[in-house]
């Protein structure tokens, strides 16, 4: 686990590639409830739950990226589309053993609060983006909303996998009024989250 600012970005990419990203407890509980009546579950039922959790959404898109054939040029940009591609029973098989963020961060409550704060911000940004795109009659409403939901994914992952570093960034921002998040990330991580997303989630 990268636990110092000297950790190279490639170390992060290897960690994220080999780790199981946790999801919110409410997400796991809701999906477990659906799984009990799987024959009556639709892709939309699953999507309505997954789309409320940026961590679950990221896991879902990652799975679809793995399963897509190189001959399939159609890009899937909605959570429901991802579930349709995977199929309902295969979805529950693939995510039968979800890790829970609240359990992972039980011993570091400050990190859990930090993670949940970013999740709430991302959900609000996604909802506002969807409303604005709908008002503009944009043809890519789902894509815009998902982009907003996942915009701060790298920050969430730092809280999950390196909470000490995330707290250093938080302290630096509080001590330096007017400092941008990117500058704080560069100071602590030696790279900004945008770079991490481009390299690790491409």
Model regions: which residues?
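Conserved alpha-helical "signature site"
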Residues: 1-170, 174-202
């Amino acid at each position: 686990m990268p636990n110092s600012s000297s950790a190279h970005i490639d170390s992060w990419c290897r960690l994220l590639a080999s780790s199981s990203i946790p999801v919110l407890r409410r997400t796991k509980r809701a999906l477990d409830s659906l799984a009990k009546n799987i024959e009556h579950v639709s892709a939309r039922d699953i999507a309505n739950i997954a789309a409320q959790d940026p961590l679950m959404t990221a896991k879902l898109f990652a799975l679809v990226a793995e399963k897509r054939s190189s001959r399939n040029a159609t890009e899937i940009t909605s959570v429901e589309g991802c579930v349709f591609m995977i199929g309902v029973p295969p979805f529950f098989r693939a995510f039968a053993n979800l890790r829970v963020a609240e359990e992972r961060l039980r011993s570091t409550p400050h990190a859990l609060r930090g993670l949940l704060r970013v999740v709430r911000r991302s959900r609000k940004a996604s909802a506002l983006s969807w409303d604005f795109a709908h008002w503009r009659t944009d043809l890519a409403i789902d894509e815009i909303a998902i982009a907003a939901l996942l915009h701060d994914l790298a920050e969430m992952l730092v809280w999950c996998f390196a909470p000490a570093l995330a707290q250093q960034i938080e302290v630096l921002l509080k001590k330096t009024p007017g400092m941008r998040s990117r500058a704080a990330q560069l100071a602590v991580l030696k790279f900004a989250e945008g770079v991490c997303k481009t390299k690790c989630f491409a």
